[in-house]
Structures are given as C-alpha cells and as structure tokens.
C-alpha cells in the first residue's frame, strides 16, 4: 500500500451515531419479545409445556445476545468518538507546530 491513510473525524462521528442506533435497535428487539414466553404459557397451557420450555431457552439466548449487541454498540460508538477527538486534537497540534515554524 503506497497510498496515504486519511482519517475524517466527522465520518467517525457518523459511524458512532450508526452504532448508537444499532444499540437502541438491539434493546428494542429484546423489549419486543419480553413476556412472550409467559403469554404463550398462559394461552396454550401445560399441553405445550415442551414448546414453552424451548421458547424460554430461545428467549434467554435472545436477551443475552441483545444485551451483548447493545453493549458492543455503545462501546464502539464511544471508542469512535474518542478516536475522532484524538485525531482532531493531533491535527490541530501539528498545525500549530508547523505554523510556528513559519512565523
């Protein structure tokens, strides 16, 4: 690779916002399924207990995954914002240093 790497802090901010939204969506997905197992158990009764048990196992895994995705999205968004700030500050520091050489 001979091309220069460029970082656009504004783009990192946009990506951070996308990950914030993904975190909210993951939480919404978990909330949408909340109570489903109990509802099925009530409406279908003990006759479907094996299905209800399987559904509860699925919902437990669904909740864990949703929680993990939410945490990962929030953490990644935070890291992207920190990186954007660091790149901006470094650019500003180098700009001042270079300007100081010519004044």
Curated annotation (Swiss-Prot):
Q: What is its main location?
A: secreted
Residues recorded as bearing N-acetylthreonine in the entry: 2
The protein finds application as follows: Contains multiple, broadly recognized T-cell epitopes and is a major target of cellular immunity in both active and latent tuberculosis infection, indicating this might be a good vaccine candidate. A fusion protein (p846) of 3 well-defined antigens (EspC, EsxH and Rv2660c) induces robust specific T-cell immune response and could be an effective vaccine.
The Gene Ontology biological process annotation of the record reads: biological process involved in interaction with host; protein secretion by the type VII secretion system; symbiont-mediated evasion of host immune response
Upregulation: Transcriptionally activated by EspR. Repressed by the MprB/MprA two-component system, by direct regulation and via EspR. Up-regulated by the PhoP/PhoR two-component system, via EspR.
What UniProt keywords are attached to this protein's entry? Acetylation, Secreted, Virulence
List cellular component terms (GO).
Answer: extracellular region; peptidoglycan-based cell wall
Q: So which domain of life are we looking at?
A: Bacteria
The entry summarizes the disruption phenotype as follows: Mutant exhibits pathogenesis defects, including reduced virulence in mice, attenuated growth in macrophages and an inability to suppress immunostimulatory cytokines such as IL-12. Host (human) cells no longer produce cytokine IP-10 (CXCL10) upon infection, but continue to produce IL-1 beta (IL1B).
- What is the residue range of the signal peptide feature? none
**Which InterPro entries does its entry note?**
EspC (IPR022536)
Asked if the keyword ATP-binding belongs to this entry, the reply reads: no
Q: Tell me how this protein assembles.
A: Interacts with EccA1 and EspF.
- What is recorded about the domains? The C-terminal region is required for secretion by the ESX-1 system.
Record's function text: Required for ESX-1 function. Required for either stability or expression of EspA.
Protein known as? ESX-1 secretion-associated protein EspC
From which source organism is this entry?
Mycobacterium tuberculosis (strain ATCC 25618 / H37Rv)
């Amino acid at each position: 690779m001979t091309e220069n790497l460029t970082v656009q802090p504004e783009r990192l901010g946009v990506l951070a916002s996308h990950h914030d939204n993904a975190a909210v969506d993951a939480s919404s997905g978990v909330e949408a399924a909340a109570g489903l197992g109990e509802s099925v158990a009530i409406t279908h009764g003990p006759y479907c207990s094996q299905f209800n048990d399987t559904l509860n196992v699925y919902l437990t895994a669904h909740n864990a995954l949703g929680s993990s995705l939410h945490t990962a999205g929030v953490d990644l968004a935070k890291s992207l914002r920190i990186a954007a700030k660091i790149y901006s500050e470094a650019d500003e520091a180098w700009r001042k240093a270079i300007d100081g050489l010519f004044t």
